[in-house]
Amino acid sequence: MLSLESEVLTRHLPLFANKSILLFGDVRDRFADQIKANAKSVAVFSSYFDYARQYADVSFGLYCEIKAELAVFYWTKNKQECQYQLLQWLSQVDVGQEMLIIGENRAGVRSVEKLLEPYGNIAKIDSARRCGLYHFELQSVPDFDGKKFWKSYRLQDLNIFALPAVFSSAELDGGTQLLLSTFNKADRLKGKVLDLGCGAGVIGASLKQQFEKIKLTMSDIHAMALESSRRTFAENALDGTVVASDVFSNIEERFDLIVSNPPFHDGIDTAYRAVEDLIAQAKQRLNRGGELRIVANAFLPYPDLLDKAFGSHQVIAKSNKFKVYSAKA
């Protein structure tokens, strides 16, 4: 099934004929298969591991270094993330480079005109399916300074670092704050700990600082989150393993504690698939007596999922907005 963005692109198939093509940005479907027959070659790059892991021909990472005669960028909901990815890629190509930018109007794709105008000619060439399609030709190669995109803030004795689109990138969010408040030195936490959906590494860094002897693994699907966690740990001289994983897809070991402030937003829609998988599979990923501890908006339907997977659960902290759930294997 094609996304709305790709449906618009199918109206312009002649543009892809006999050219090397790169699809990158928020690619979520198999539009690549639609153009392989007529294009010279098709490459796909994604910063999202949940998508990239499904297909052998999709490259995953933070920096896209793939060149092509025509690039197609799928706009994401986060303007700064788009700016980072577009300027990073354009900084390494030549004047005259052609690019198409496609995105939903509600995701703010219109702002691409102001973003790319200083670097070349940009024009809207189609409007359909509540999306805008733009053609861009590079006239002035931009300088890309990745350092300018970093945000940081202080959390007690920790320095937290985050790239665009990483959750809780500017300050500690209320849910994570409530979750962290349920840990204290008296817990004597030890063994293997997994911070799943680690974002900027806030939870993992806080636990590692309090409980030095834990063996910590942090995972996320977003390349920007993984890089953010790595930097947070490096800047605070903490030890931890950072892995790209779609829930447990790339994690084989068992843990004594799995802790998470799980995402329930996918792009600009709400999605529960990752959280459902986390709760359903967590018991099999815990050692005997191990614990799953998660925080969530109070209105989300997690109690039933926890009871189905574990038999029972406890609410160990709550605020007006959030609840912290604990379930034991």
From Swiss-Prot:
Q: Does the keyword Disulfide bond apply?
A: no
Q: Where in the cell is it found?
A: Cytoplasm
Presence of keyword S-adenosyl-L-methionine? yes
Q: Which UniProt keywords apply?
A: Cytoplasm, Methyltransferase, rRNA processing, S-adenosyl-L-methionine, Transferase
Annotated TM spans? none
Query: What reaction does this enzyme carry out catalytically?
Result: guanosine(1207) in 16S rRNA + S-adenosyl-L-methionine = N(2)-methylguanosine(1207) in 16S rRNA + S-adenosyl-L-homocysteine + H(+)
Q: Which domain of life does the protein's organism represent?
A: Bacteria
One molecular function GO term is: nucleic acid binding
Q: What is its EC number?
A: 2.1.1.172
Which Pfam families does the protein's record reference? MTS, MTS_N
One cellular component term (GO) for this entry is: cytoplasm
Summarize the protein's role.
Answer: Specifically methylates the guanine in position 1207 of 16S rRNA in the 30S particle.
Family membership noted in the UniProt record: Belongs to the methyltransferase superfamily. RsmC family.
Quaternary structure (record): Monomer.
This protein is called what? Ribosomal RNA small subunit methyltransferase C
Identify the species of origin: Actinobacillus pleuropneumoniae serotype 5b (strain L20)
Give the organism's phylogenetic lineage.
Bacteria, Pseudomonadati, Pseudomonadota, Gammaproteobacteria, Pasteurellales
